[in-house]
Swiss-Prot record:
Catalytic activity as recorded in UniProt: a ubiquinone + NADH + 5 H(+)(in) = a ubiquinol + NAD(+) + 4 H(+)(out)
The family this protein is said to belong to: Belongs to the complex I subunit 4 family.
Name of the protein in its database record: NADH-ubiquinone oxidoreductase chain 4
Coiled coil feature spans: none
Gene Ontology biological-process annotations: electron transport coupled proton transport; mitochondrial electron transport, NADH to ubiquinone; mitochondrial respiratory chain complex I assembly
Summary of the function given for this chain in its UniProt record: Core subunit of the mitochondrial membrane respiratory chain NADH dehydrogenase (Complex I) which catalyzes electron transfer from NADH through the respiratory chain, using ubiquinone as an electron acceptor. Essential for the catalytic activity and assembly of complex I.
The organism of origin for this protein: Lepilemur septentrionalis (Northern sportive lemur)
Keywords, sorted A to Z: Electron transport, Membrane, Mitochondrion, Mitochondrion inner membrane, NAD, Respiratory chain, Translocase, Transmembrane, Transmembrane helix, Transport, Ubiquinone
Amino acid sequence: MLKIIIPTIMLLPVTWFSANSMVWINITLHSLTISLMSLSFLNQTDSNSNNFSSTFFSDPLSSPLLTLTMWLLPLTIMASQHHLSKEPWERKKYFLFTLISLQLFLIMTFTATELIMFYILFESTLIPTLIIITRWGNQTERLNAGLYFLFYTLIGSLPLLVALSFIQKHMGTLNLFMMTYWSQELPNSWSSNLMWMACIMAFMIKMPLYGLHLWLPKAHVEAPIAGSMILAAILLKLGGYGMMRITTILNPLTKFMAYPFLMLCLWGMIMTSLICLRQTDLKSLIAYSSVSHMALVIVAILIQTPWSFMGATALMIAHGLTSSMLFCLANSNYERIHNRTMLLARGLQSLLPLMSTWWLLASLTNLALPPSINLIGELFITMATFSWSNMTIILTGLNMLITATYSLHMLAMTQRGKSLYHMHNLNPSLTRENTLMSMHIFPLLLLTLNPNILMGPTY
């Protein structure tokens, strides 16, 4: 584990001590090297972790998320260059320092063995994200978005701390390895039900669960491009990862307590997809699309079958890359037109044909076109929910239909049609942008050849 944690820590002094002209090159190249080193974690053939200590470990569930976290740092740095071009060098370095420290917290969160350490690091990711949103966001509403993000997360997390203290008192340990072999089942009483709720709600808010999702569109829309990418690709997945880790400990209560949440997720999945059809703001549409996809993941985790767990891990990774790419594309439009409204950004296909290709690929992966990983994840989840209750096929099928509709609507609105007069002198697409898009889409295409490395410990 230290082979990626120590080099990431060393990126912090590199940021401050590099010459101004070399900062972007140094940080991008070094972070890309670290992300290539982290690919070795995917080569874990069985569910036993070959790489653990008493502090950090990685297994087939955390490894894909770890690799995704590492892969995204160079991409966020590349995407932010235009956004920071007019800032003084001190602020650019401060921004990179914040990004790298967030990366460090995320790596340690995904690899923590103790639940209390996981909790501390889980909360630590809040601070750099909040700084990125409130300091580098575009509009003044970013302060309101930051407040929403902060209080939703904190209100959900405090009961988790109380529940973890309670478990520590009764079991004497919060080590994940020890707790997996804890044979004592929780009794079906009010106190146990409250403890289950306390453990789960922090992760439900982070995912987010429909009804507790209001912070997400605000945070996404107001955050700079790096903030949006990390929020969509990794911070939402922290909730899914935490739920997967903690629900296995809380059995058999999950079977009794999951029903209202399953209903809410299946209902919210349809509702947020319908909201996407009505959106005019491009970033807001992609944010609501994330809520819809994450509702599927919550359903899969609560059903607690091997197939649903495989579908959840596959969909989390696929959605991380897809939504991050869509935010990059929306940002490339915003940098040229300075507007997020889809009606004012029509006909881009004739002006930026290569960018239009990236739009097509991103939209098709978002609507889960075969043979993408998104489809594999959604099919596994659909089959798992169908075996849980036959009626759910109506809702999951309808969700797939609406997802395809709004994805194609987004593509048609931005790329097709007659371009408006104010768009005729746009800057052409840059090599940096095309590299950025290809580094999002190629992992998605390559993973279709060998999806089993994403399927988690139940594969």
